[in-house]
Amino acid sequence: MDTIITNAFFENKTTIELARDILGMRLVHQTTNGKLSGLIVETEAYLGATDMAAHSFQNLRTKRTEVMFSSPGRIYMYQMHRQVLLNFITMPEGIPEAILIRAIEPEEQAKHLMEQNRGGKTGYELTNGPGKLTQALGLSMQDYGKTLFDSNIWLEEAKTPHLIEATNRIGVPNKGIATHFPLRFTVKGSPYLSAQRKSRILADIWE
């Protein structure tokens, strides 16, 4: 069995470092119907008080963002366009930074259940976006505030990417200089990346 990530993983690292290091890890959701899982292939870092694209910009503290001010490994779920998005808090209490999980590569043994959750969607469309992966994994707003260390959602060490690319984040226009921050991190060549071009898909993406 692969090593389950503990809170030690989050210690002495920046949010940017964590957003890169989490690529290739297995994201697991244990449900009553079975274990659903996939390898993380795309993330975005959100840098809190100084990041205009972050919900917690200027330390904005609301009912929705309250969990962002808690401890590393806490789960921040929010809704956008009727989709639910999954984030992990990264910094010590009071520093509201987070990682958005944008795409995963579904694992073969979990695909059938994940396809059912997605209404029969198959192939790359299954999990190649932040709202798609949460639906496939059966995650919901009820998971808001859970931790990765003592709940039915956790991370495991799994694979190491050959190459990681950094680009601008998706869907954050009109956010000043934050629009152009290279804070989207991807496993180069993964077919499951959001808006991935066929010409950029590689056959061998893991070490």
From Swiss-Prot:
One of its GO terms (molecular function) is DNA binding. This is Putative 3-methyladenine DNA glycosylase. The keyword DNA repair applies. Belongs to the DNA glycosylase MPG family. Its EC number is 3.2.2.-. Pfam families: Pur_DNA_glyco. GO terms for biological process: base-excision repair. Disulfide bonds: none annotated. Keywords: DNA damage, DNA repair, Hydrolase. InterPro entries: Formyl_transferase-like_C_sf (IPR011034), MPG (IPR003180), MPG_sf (IPR036995).
